[in-house]
């Protein structure tokens, strides 16, 4: 039996987190905004979404540092139709998840934290 390649492991992490019932879609991006893998349909301009999300995360990290705050845990973008939550997954990657508007945010954040730790382990 052959070992899974890192990309297969990352795709498995996304599929697992999407099974929670609270998360609609998810993606992993490099901190510079390059798509690593995603469960989003191609028609949604995934590359643009992850690039803009990484830019927002980086800007929020700079703002937090300038304000003397601790390291940034996450960004949450809310609209009436849903949420986009981004969190660091080690020094190399970001985990981005899309949810509906009426989620149990605490449960989602716990699942995101577990998934980001797994991503960090895969990417080293």
Predicted regions and their residues:
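Acidic, low-complexity cytosolic segments
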Residues: 1-23, 32-124
